[in-house]
A protein has these predicted regions:
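A short, basic-hydrophobic beta/loop patch
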Residues: 1-47, 98
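Amphipathic alpha-helical extensions and coiled-coil-like segments
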Residues: 48-169
Length: 169
């Protein structure tokens, strides 16, 4: 028997248009290969949200042993686009839902990843309520990292002063 792996919407549209013939590629594929081809076809749809897309890439990588480079080549996207999509999956589930629902953009999601994990849910909630832009989140993250670096430098100076005092004693 034959099974449509990719192009079911085109096939349905051709039936609605009463076409008697539809161009097709007939090939043998085991269940695993059929699933891979169907997933790749679905990832090329324009109506996927960024989280669905990221989950699709993750499936290609984990289930089919592809690299990001392999996956990007199969779906016609750049490796960096695949990598950026996958980064979103590191967000907490409730924040990922906000991105999936469109309350936050993918840019917001990636910007939030620069903050400590325990701060991300509250920052996401604030961003939704206050309409914080991606650029504002990026500036906040940069300021936080600058303060962390300053704190680290102060600790290093204190440690060196302490060691100098110990050597003098």
């Amino acid at each position: 028997y034959y099974q449509i792996i990719a192009g079911e919407r085109r096939w349905r549209a051709s039936r609605m248009a009463n076409l008697s013939e539809v161009p097709a590629v007939v090939m043998e594929a085991d269940d695993c290969k059929a699933m891979e081809l169907a997933l790749i076809e679905n990832l090329q749809r324009s109506d996927l949200n960024c989280v669905e897309e990221a989950l699709g890439y993750q499936t290609l990588i984990e289930h089919f042993g592809m690299t990001q480079e392999d996956a990007s080549g199969r779906v016609g996207k750049s490796r960096s686009a695949v990598a950026n999509a996958l980064r979103l999956l590191a967000l907490p589930e409730d924040v990922l839902k906000k991105v999936s629902d469109g309350q936050l953009s993918p840019g917001h999601g990636r910007s939030l990843l620069a903050f400590p994990a325990e701060q991300i849910p509250q920052l996401a909630e604030d961003a939704v309520k206050k309409g914080t832009t991606v650029r504002e989140l990026e500036r906040m993250a940069k300021a936080l990292n600058r303060k962390k670096n300053d704190d680290d430098n102060i600790k290093a100076v204190r440690r060196n002063v302490f060691l100098d005092e110990v050597e003098l004693a």
